[in-house]
Design a protein with these regions (language model features):
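N-terminal targeting signals for export/organelle localization
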Residues: 1-13, 17
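Short, small/polar residue-rich loop motifs at catalytic or cofactor-binding pockets
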Residues: 10, 45, 124-126, 195-200
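A short beta-strand-turn-helix
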Residues: 15-47
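Short pre-active-site segment immediately N-terminal to redox-active cysteine/selenocysteine motifs
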Residues: 44-47, 51-55, 125
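Conserved redox-active cysteine motifs that mediate thiol-disulfide chemistry
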Residues: 50-71
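Conserved segment of the thioredoxin-like fold in thiol-based oxidoreductases
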Residues: 69-113, 119-126
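Thiol/disulfide oxidoreductase modules built on the thioredoxin-like
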Residues: 100-101, 109-153
């Protein structure tokens, strides 16, 4: 790592934009310590930059640890993947199929050595990761995700990593949320008839004003397959059709019940209300 940017170097700035709209999604320099219009100091945020590519075997080997970093320090650091993939579609497919799409990605769509960011950050090997401090300077660099985790753990133990994200929460807390879900959820009759059970993860956005939008299904897990005399009488094709109907009904009910919850207390980033992605698990089981 001797060729990498030295500790204390101002981290070269870069920006992630929406490919379709050109809208800014992220700019590194926006996350430095700053003073707002009222003269109040807004603390900066620690940022991990992970340089990688989906075609790189060592990068793929390190990805589970990068995901662990993302999960463990979700509210305390920004994690940005910087990919040297030339095919963004392939990159996105790799990320989504392996559930590595929970953090931001920067990709110029050019060959590694032709990218500006590889020159700015002196990247001669991947994977490589940098830790940028709240003042926007290089604090640490490594070619091993495990070492980055150890550095973050050390900083966290010293109390230097503090939450900059406040997650949305339901008025009255989790117990009230669970009660609302339990009271308002209706068990579909077809699912009851065939004694089916499932766990549905419903995802949605809690908007800045606390309203819920973009409600959809993140995952569906069968807990009990349909069974009983009525189900066993069906042909193979009919059983397949029933399973599909059961899934549709459970998913529709999950979406419906989340839409009945009303307003949430919105999440905040650095003290300002913001849109936050959220998931709620709903278990459908009668017995």
């Amino acid at each position: 790592t001797t060729e990498l940017l030295p500790v204390g170097t101002e981290a070269p700035d870069f920006q992630i934009t929406n490919d379709k709209t050109g809208e800014k999604i992220f700019r590194l320099s926006d996350w430095k310590t700053k003073t707002d219009a009222d003269g109040k100091v807004v603390p900066g945020v620690w940022t991990v930059l992970d340089f990688w590519a989906s075609w790189c075997p060592d990068c793929r080997k390190d990805m589970p640890k990068v995901k662990e970093i993302s999960k463990k320090y979700l509210t305390k650091i920004q994690l940005v993947g910087i990919s040297f993939d030339t095919d963004k579609e392939k990159m996105n497919k790799y990320l989504s199929s392996n559930h590595y799409d929970q953090w931001m990605q920067y990709c110029e769509g050019k060959k590694w050595k032709e990218t500006q960011i590889s020159k700015d950050y002196h990247i001669s090997w991947i994977p490589t990761s940098y830790l940028i401090d709240p003042e926007g300077k290089v604090y640490f660099s490594t070619v091993k995700a495990e070492e980055m985790m150890q550095k973050l753990d050390s900083l966290n133990n010293l109390g230097k990593l503090t939450a900059f994200i406040e997650m949305p929460h339901y008025p009255g807390g989790k117990a009230v949320l669970m009660k609302q879900l339990s009271v308002n959820t209706k068990f579909p009759k077809l699912c009851q008839k065939y004694k089916a059970a499932a766990k549905v993860k419903v995802e949605f956005i809690v908007e800045k004003d606390g309203n819920v939008s973009d409600v959809g299904i993140q995952s569906y897990q069968v807990l009990d397959n349909p069974n009983g005399k009525d189900f066993n009488k069906l042909s193979g094709a009919e059983q397949t059709q029933v399973r599909s109907q059961i899934r549709t009904l459970f998913e529709q009910e999950g979406i419906r019940v989340v839409n009945t919850l009303g307003k949430w207390i919105p999440g905040k980033i650095r003290g300002e209300a913001t849109r936050v992605h959220y998931t709620v698990p709903i278990v459908f089981r009668l017995y």
